[in-house]
Amino acid sequence: MQFQYSPYILPLLACAVIAGFVAVYGWQRRATVNGAAYLALLALACGEWSLGYALEIAGADLPTKVFWGKSQYIGICTVPILWVIFASAHATPGAGITRRNLVQLSIVPFITLLLAFTTELHGLIWSSVQILNVGTFSALNVTHGLWFWVYLIYSYILLGAGTFFILDSLNRRKGLFRRQNIILLLAVLIAWVGNLLYVLGL
C-alpha cells in the first residue's frame, strides 16, 4: 500500500479519535446508563468509517484507495443497525431487541458487505472505479451499482426509524434527557445532510 499526506484527512482522523473516546466512555457506563453499550458500538462503527475514508484519501494509488474504500463498508453496514437499536434503547428505557430481530435487521447489511468486498465480480456496489483528483484532494470516483441503491433505501429506513424513536421520546422526556435527545437529533441531521451530499455528488 502507498500513502501520501493530505490535509483533508485531518478532520476525519479527529472524528475517528473523538469516536474512540465516545466508545470508551459509553462502554465504561454500559451497566448504569441505558443504551450506553449500543452507543459505544455505534461510535466504533462511525470511527471505523471515518478512519477508512481518511486512509482512502491518503492512498497514493488506485489499489490502496479501493481497499480502504471497501473497508468503509464495515461501518456503512453497521451504523444504521446500531443507530436504530441505540435509539430504541435510549428513547424507551427497558426496551431491548431480540436475537431474531437482530438477525433479521442484519441480513441486508451482511449481503451488502459481502457484495462490497467482491464488487469487481459483479459490479453491484461499484460498476466502475477511478481516482478523482481535485486540487490536492484525491479520492475514489465510483459509479454505483444496483445493490448500492437498494442498501441506501434500507439504511435510510433504519435511520428514519431511529430518528422517529428519538422524536417520539421528546414528548415524554424533560430536562437533561430532552436536551440529550435534541443533541442526538442535530447529530443525525448533520449525518443525513452529509450523506445526501455524497449521494448527489455535491
Where are these regions (language model features)?
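Surface-exposed acidic, glycine/proline-enriched linker/cap segments
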Residues: T136-V142
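Interfacial "cap-and-anchor" motif at the non-cytosolic start of specific transmembrane alpha-helices
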Residues: Y5, I9, A36, A40-L41, ...
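Hydrophobic alpha-helical transmembrane segments
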Residues: Y25-Q28, L113-T118, N195-L202
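A broad "ordered helical/assembly scaffold" signature
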Residues: W126-S127, A139, F177-R178
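Structural signal for the C-terminal ends of transmembrane alpha-helices
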Residues: V24-A31, S88-P93, I166-K174
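Individual alpha-helical transmembrane segments in multi-pass integral membrane proteins
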Residues: Q2-G20, R30-L132, T143-G160, V188
